């Protein structure tokens, strides 16, 4: 399957891990999707989920200056996860920032409120500079 679908699954895994009642490990959360999606790029999913979870404070510090009158904690959970994922991938992969940003916008359109993709795109545009 495509990298795009792997990003969707990484997002859903991170969302699951963010639930207050969740005591799942990263590997346990990822294992839930393996049985139903054997063609996904699980190496990429694990890299992205582990990277985001392992670097949350640094990612939040990177994102925060561009939030304009917002804090990370006030963002919708979906937006916070998407920003962290995209920021991590922009900073730690060879994938062109433009591709990562486009995928983040598409995730936002799929999982967040109607116009939030504009906000996500604006924040990521500043981060990639």
UniProtKB/Swiss-Prot annotation:
Alphabetized InterPro entries for the sequence: NusB-like_sf (IPR035926), NusB_fam (IPR011605), NusB_RsmB_TIM44 (IPR006027)
Database matches in Pfam families: NusB
UniProt keyword terms in alphabetical order: RNA-binding, Transcription, Transcription antitermination, Transcription regulation
Any one GO MF annotation of this record: RNA binding
GO cellular component: cytosol
Biological process annotations from GO: DNA-templated transcription termination; transcription antitermination
Function, in words: Involved in transcription antitermination. Required for transcription of ribosomal RNA (rRNA) genes. Binds specifically to the boxA antiterminator sequence of the ribosomal RNA (rrn) operons.
NCBIfam families assigned: nusB (TIGR01951)
Record-stated family: Belongs to the NusB family.
Name the UniProt record assigns to this protein: Transcription antitermination protein NusB
Source species of the chain: Staphylococcus aureus (strain USA300 / TCH1516)
Lineage: Bacteria, Bacillati, Bacillota, Bacilli, Bacillales
